[in-house]
Design a protein with these regions (language model features):
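Acidic/polar N-terminal loop/beta-strand segments that form early-domain functional surfaces
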Residues: 29, 52, 62-64, 216, ...
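Generic, ordered loop/turn and secondary-structure boundary motif
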Residues: 75-77, 178-180, 184, 197, ...
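Aromatic-lined carbohydrate-binding/catalytic grooves of carbohydrate-active enzymes
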Residues: 276-378
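A low-complexity, Ser/Thr/Gly/Pro-enriched, surface-exposed linker/loop concept
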Residues: 1-35, 39-93
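A generic "cationic amphipathic patch" detector
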Residues: 56, 61-62, 70-72, 226, ...
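Catalytic and substrate-binding clefts that recognize carbohydrates or anionic sugar/phosphate headgroups
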Residues: 30, 39-41, 83-280, 288-291, ...
């Protein structure tokens, strides 16, 4: 049963397949086409499979290719010279990227997509998985009645009435991990995950480090290449599937295979960028003021001196957000009530061979003078 206000059009029939030297494109109808008249109505999805990096399959689902792509976009390190292998066999089309491959079934034209690594099935799609979802006009009007701020924080920042949804099968005993820093259980099965940043603390499903990427205990990963809101239903809406959806006429995602999860992460970071190696001291012991505790320079000095007295090596001391004055974050100004001479304090800590880390937030509160400066200068 579909939720009231939505029309769901599933990729039902593989109506036509076109192959080039580096891609396979499938045209999927939302119904079985029995005669020419049935081609006159209903959405047709254009799904392209290609590979721009070894052991990754790039999937692009498009309903209307003329939609304006406004950005922003993730920076990806794709290899324009990489060429997958395209095979046509009696039972399926196949695109091979090193040891990872996708097969598009031919049997009767039914929607049948399978992903493999070194011959082992990773995940698949079948009946009622890929879909184009249309929001009925009355619901769009109702949703857009809120203020701009309300729509933004409700994840609905546009009046786009369409949505693309994909669903990939998961097996019995398969566990899903990822989506960035989350404060729910480590295994994400059974959860609805919104990839949308909020300053929600550490005690709820909200998070400030969201990433539209997950890995499976079956040694594959899925990266949804959309920096906007992405909704994941991890064995929650349908217990045997991971569903993910984005607003608009287009979706792009990558399926990555490997022998181990570490291999999958290697493919992912090759695509999205690998972090630099941090300084050696960052691998040592850190000590923090914690979040809402009351602390000042005397408290900090006591903590550090006690670590030395107990012969506990300390590399980094972290000041949480209250190094700044409350309701002023983040203006990069020390709270002089608690830290009257921060320059001298930091010099003393440096003499003790302690590195310093301070917490920052990606906004400036209204009570800070910098807020007025920002308003004045646009």
């Amino acid at each position: 049963m579909n939720k009231s206000g939505y029309d769901v059009n599933y990729a039902t029939q593989i109506y036509e397949v076109k192959a080039t030297d580096n891609s396979i494109t499938v045209y999927a109808t939302n119904q079985w086409i029995g005669n020419r008249g049935m081609t006159l109505g209903g959405p047709v999805l254009e799904i392209t499979f290609t590979s721009t990096l070894a052991d990754s399959i790039k999937v692009t689902i498009e309903h209307y290719k003329g939609a304006v792509k406004k950005g922003p976009d993730f920076t990806l390190y794709e290899d324009a010279n990489f060429k997958p292998v395209i095979n046509e066999k009696d039972e399926y089309w196949e695109l091979v990227s090193n040891k990872t491959s996708v097969r598009i079934g031919k049997a009767g034209g039914a929607w049948d997509i399978k992903y493999f690594y070194d011959g082992k099935l990773l995940t698949k799609e079948g009946w009622r998985t890929t879909s184009y979802i249309e929001e009925q006009p009355w619901l769009t009007d109702y949703r857009m009645e809120g203020t701009k701020a309300e729509r933004f924080y409700a994840h609905a920042s546009t009046d786009e009435p369409a949505r693309i949804r994909e669903m990939l099968n998961i097996s019995v005993g398969e566990n899903i991990y990822g989506f960035g820093e989350k404060f729910s259980t480590f295994v994400k099965n059974g959860q609805t995950v919104e990839v949308w940043n909020n300053d929600g603390g550490t005690c709820s499903e909200q998070t400030y480090k969201s990433i539209p990427f997950y890995v499976s205990s079956r040694n594959y990963g899925v990266f949804v290449n959309h920096p906007e809101n992405v909704t994941f239903e991890v064995a929650s809406e349908t217990v045997s599937k991971v569903a993910f959806s984005v607003q608009g006429e287009r979706m792009e995602y990558f399926v990555m295979g490997g022998k181990t999860i570490a291999d999958v992460l290697g493919v992912y970071t090759t695509l999205t960028g690998k972090p630099a190696l941090p300084p050696a001291y960052t691998f040592g012991l850190w000590l923090t003021t914690s979040f809402t505790t009351n602390y000042d320079e005397e408290t900090v000095s006591f903590f550090i001196d006690e670590m030395a007295r107990r012969d506990i090596p300390l590399e980094v001391f972290h000041f949480d957000c209250f190094w700044m004055k409350e309701f002023n974050w983040c203006d990069f100004t020390w709270d002089k009530r608690m830290f009257p001479d921060p320059k001298a304090m930091l010099a003393r800590l440096k003499e003790k061979k302690i590195e310093i880390c301070v917490w920052i937030n990606p906004y400036i509160a209204q009570q800070s003078s910098l807020f007025d400066e920002g308003v004045k200068n646009g």
